[in-house]
């Protein structure tokens, strides 16, 4: 017997609440969801949308990735709150750092993933989270397996910072919604032109927030294609 996977479906995983400390002394809170039946083949390390606009570790794409990818694709999901951000998991210490101080949060999360033996980490940012990656993660290219950018606005990222990724030794993929509020396809092509090696994937009919099951599945399938290709496309039902 199978049951359709919907926006509220929570599939089996081994879930662990975590906390870790940044180099400037703040304790951040998060969660790791591990596959329950098999070893993880890769890790999705998420950086969430803008805290001052309601972004947190439970922003819906990130939450649904945690609910689905461990069971459907043997992908571990690491999600956490940036400094000063509250979610049902708890509150990370500190205050919003305008995308600058969050460098320490990214560094600490990556170190925590390594400490816990999480395999093949991919940094996956959404909106503000993409800015933190583009600004601060290039120096970590030898520690990660790839980067996926969801709805990158390029508000805080300079052309020089984009260009620094042009020779990155890892795949970098940007998912660009057709009707994005901040960076639709044509401006995205121009904005990423300093780094032509970045793969731009245009998402037909999509918007910045990826609302609805069709857009959610598109994002999760694109993630799965990169992190565990044999598991794509993801099933839309679950055996119960």
Question: How does the language model describe each region?
Answer:
Residues 206-220:
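Catalytic histidine-centered segment of alpha/beta-hydrolase-like enzymes
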Residues 193-209:
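Catalytic histidine neighborhood in serine/cysteine hydrolases
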Residues 26-34, 39-118:
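Serine-hydrolase catalytic machinery in alpha/beta-hydrolase-like enzymes
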Residues 1-39:
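N-terminal cap/lid segment of alpha/beta-hydrolase-fold proteins
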Residues 155-156, 178-183, 208-209:
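Acidic catalytic loop of the alpha/beta-hydrolase fold
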Residues 160-162, 179-193, 215:
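Short alpha-helix in the alpha/beta-hydrolase fold that links the catalytic acid
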Residues 167-169, 174-176, 180:
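Short beta-strand/loop motif that positions the catalytic acidic residue
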Residues 125-133:
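Gly/Ala-rich beta-loop-alpha elbow adjacent to hydrolase catalytic centers
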């Amino acid at each position: 017997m199978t049951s359709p996977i919907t926006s509220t479906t929570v599939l089996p995983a081994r879930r662990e609440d975590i906390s870790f400390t940044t180099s400037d002394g703040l304790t951040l809170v998060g969660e790791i969801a591990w596959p329950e039946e098999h070893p993880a083949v890769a890790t999705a390390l998420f950086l969430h949308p803008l805290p001052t606009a309601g972004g947190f570790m439970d922003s819906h794409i990130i939450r649904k990735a945690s609910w689905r990818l461990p069971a459907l694709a043997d992908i571990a999901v690491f999600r956490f709150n940036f400094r000063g951000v509250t979610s049902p998991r708890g509150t990370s210490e500190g205050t919003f750092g305008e995308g600058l101080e969050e460098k320490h949060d990214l560094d600490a999360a990556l170190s925590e993933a390594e400490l816990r033996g999480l395999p093949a980490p991919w940094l996956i940012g959404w909106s503000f989270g993409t800015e933190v990656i583009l600004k601060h993660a290039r120096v970590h290219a030898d520690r990660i397996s790839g980067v996926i950018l969801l709805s990158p606005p390029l508000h805080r990222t300079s052309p020089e910072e984009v260009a620094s990724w042009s020779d990155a030794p890892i795949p970098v993929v940007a998912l660009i919604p057709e009707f994005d509020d901040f960076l639709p396809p044509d401006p995205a092509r121009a904005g990423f032109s300093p780094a032509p090696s970045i793969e731009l994937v245009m998402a037909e009919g999509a918007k910045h927030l990826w609302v609805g099951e069709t857009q959610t599945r598109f994002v999760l399938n694109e993630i799965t294609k990169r992190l565990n290709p044999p598991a794509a496309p993801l099933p839309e039902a679950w055996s119960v």
